[in-house]
Amino acid sequence: FCNLSYPKNRNSLLQQESLDPMANPNMYISRGAERAVSSNKVLKNTYMLLSATLAFSALMAGVSIAVALPSWMYLVSVIVAMVMGIFVLPRTANSSAGIGVIFAITGLLGLGLGSILTMYLALPKGPEIIATAFGGTGLIFLGLSGYALTSKRDFSFLGGFVFAGMMVVVIAMLANIFLAMPALSLAISGAIILLMSAFILFDTSRIINGGETNYIMATYGLYLSIFN
């Protein structure tokens, strides 16, 4: 009689076939579509929260200017915001409490920024300087984000470069405290602009390609790039 029983390794063969993209193209298309929908949702939530935090920062900066907070408040607010961003936000980013934390961080940074803007407003061409800085920052962010969104390129390779660059900038800033060289200050400012531009490309690319799935942490990264 013929042996009509199934081979013992039939289940393993079926599993291999199920993982074969040629045998099950619809499964891979479905997974790709799910990833795209998830990335688009994170991207939408990120930009909505980013817009809200920027508006809140602007409001707090206005309050800071109105009450004329001293310039040393900038350092205090940045230190407190950094501590919250490093130790508090990662622990709350997966809950609704994370939204409150991100608003607290951006509000503090807005207060500190307002104390610096107060000094610039006292200069002869202070308002023009501030308008140019804000306008340039907005154009750079929109341009780089638009490029990352339309090109859909993977800019994850910039991660190591940005980290190394930030270490160099921090060392240069510490050295310039003692050297007080105007040329070095200008070079540091230019380097920070380039590094923050790379950060915008890196963070936006991670959201698009599914590398960042938490919109609160994504908002925090993009906000810091704009703030700096």
What are these regions (language model features)?
Residues C2-N228:
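A hydrophobic alpha-helical transmembrane-helix feature that marks the membrane cores
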